[in-house]
From Swiss-Prot:
Positions that bind a 1,2-diacyl-sn-glycero-3-phospho-(1D-myo-inositol-3,4-bisphosphate): D185, K190, V191, R192, K217, R221
Entry keyword set: Cytoplasm, Disease variant, Lipid-binding, Transport
Gene: TTPA
BP term (GO), one: positive regulation of amyloid-beta clearance
Main localisation: cytoplasm
Protein function: Binds alpha-tocopherol, enhances its transfer between separate membranes, and stimulates its release from liver cells. Binds both phosphatidylinositol 3,4-bisphosphate and phosphatidylinositol 4,5-bisphosphate; the resulting conformation change is important for the release of the bound alpha-tocopherol.
Location(s), subcellular: Cytoplasm
GO molecular function, one term: phosphatidylinositol bisphosphate binding
Protein species of origin: Homo sapiens
Region described as Disordered: spans on this chain: 1-20
Comp. bias regions, Polar residues: 1-12
Protein name: Alpha-tocopherol transfer protein
Amino acid sequence: MAEARSQPSAGPQLNALPDHSPLLQPGLAALRRRAREAGVPLAPLPLTDSFLLRFLRARDFDLDLAWRLLKNYYKWRAECPEISADLHPRSIIGLLKAGYHGVLRSRDPTGSKVLIYRIAHWDPKVFTAYDVFRVSLITSELIVQEVETQRNGIKAIFDLEGWQFSHAFQITPSVAKKIAAVLTDSFPLKVRGIHLINEPVIFHAVFSMIKPFLTEKIKERIHMHGNNYKQSLLQHFPDILPLEYGGEEFSMEDICQEWTNFIMKSEDYLSSISESIQ
């Protein structure tokens, strides 16, 4: 029997449908069939509809692209157990308590989830680049469960104030390649924008190491705002930023604590997917 393949033009219409829509079943069945025929492991992530929809939505229901993304996701997790095999919150609690990472309370005008990372709160003498990477992976595994995030993707703000040589030394070519893989075609989230602020001159050497591994689409979505960033950042994220970045209603401390609490409450789920993929 010929395998159904969604036409790219149908992607936006299918993306807007709820998980239980019968119109999604052909794509789900076809992707599940490919995964089973290829012997994709059923643990720790069974091939449920909700799991497979992440990959279909991330590639606008193009079956071939969704299948490639699914394969790359398993390949990346299998090849990076130092990051992906331990997603227990306790593995990153120190970074969370330091205020390194928070998630904005509201989405941006396009519906994207907005994440903030503050390099000054990463002590490279205490936490490795893999620890920092694991923070992003844990957040990604949690927010990818949200249908609206599957549809509208994410945007990330990196505050690079405090970036030092000790941070740069942690980003080896191997780490750079793993970062690029997740940003491009190894995780079922649409990366809609990467915003860098307070970037020092010494950061550009690290960025030049990561850049060759990025797709042109991702490169086009990277915005460097410099030190005088507030006006340009507010244009992208009006009315949703914390006080430190030009907002009016809440602080970074507030959202860091809120997100830390959410991660800790999600410990059972994170533990359930914290297995090495063979």
